[in-house]
């Protein structure tokens, strides 16, 4: 969120600064020629107008529809500031952004999380109520290699050694394929579904995902905590997962925009949200 939030704030500042003078006012003078506010606005609108307007509308709609406490905004803002360290103030000065502009973006982000939370059902929470498991895998590019690895495992060869020999996952191969502990929603669906069907020390058949073919071994299954104790964590994970789902987010935001009765008067941008609806319909047909 951090760099994106600064970028969003920067574009908002540009848009707002363009509105602060009359259209004929010069914002740049030089021997090569002057630039008026109107010229600047038209150029900005051509290059990034739809994205900037989309972000500004989304921000207003979310903040209006979902109440976020000031203390929560301050907490998230402080976390963000801490991550940037000494660079934070420098970045704000370089881009001409005020802290309040960043805080507005943070408020919109937290409001968005509330909007996503509202869509999560008890059924979804219970479906994702699974024990924390530890697994290792051997990731290969093709099915033939996966079958070869599986055959060698059947001959008694070490899973860890075969991971070092064959695995394409540079992050885990030198650890014998160890991925550590994870819960529901942390892995791609095909991997997760297969892993949760295994007993401790059981090895899967080759599992195909977008990354290739996995041979999975579950090495530990933790005792499951009571549902009420982990419900909040499950919800947080689902919010993060849904926020990465472009189709879900488009659908969610179009519903929010429809409720807000958004109308765009600028002739060049008036079809912005109609275009989004059309794009959503195309995605649904795929």
From Swiss-Prot:
Documented EC number(s): 5.2.1.8
Cysteines paired by S-S bonds: none
GO biological process annotation, one example: protein folding
GO MF annotations in UniProt: peptidyl-prolyl cis-trans isomerase activity
Name of the protein: Foldase protein PrsA 1
Residues with a covalently attached lipid (N-palmitoyl cysteine): 19
Class of enzymatic activity (EC top level): isomerase
This protein's record includes keyword 4Fe-4S: no
Catalysed reaction equations from the record: [protein]-peptidylproline (omega=180) = [protein]-peptidylproline (omega=0)
Lipoprotein found in the keyword field: yes
Gene3D superfamilies documented for this protein: 3.10.50.40, Trigger factor, C-terminal domain
Annotated compartments: Cell membrane
Record key words, sorted: Cell membrane, Isomerase, Lipoprotein, Membrane, Palmitate, Rotamase, Signal
Covalently attached lipid (S-diacylglycerol cysteine), positions: 19
Pfam families per UniProt: Rotamase_3 (PF13616)
Coarse class of the protein's main subcellular location: membrane
Function: Plays a major role in protein secretion by helping the post-translocational extracellular folding of several secreted proteins.
UniProt similarity note: Belongs to the PrsA family.
Organism: Bacillus cereus (strain ATCC 14579 / DSM 31 / CCUG 7414 / JCM 2152 / NBRC 15305 / NCIMB 9373 / NCTC 2599 / NRRL B-3711)
Membrane topology listed for this record: Lipid-anchor
GO cellular component: a single term: plasma membrane
Every PpiC domain range: 130-220
Residues spanning the signal sequence: 1-18
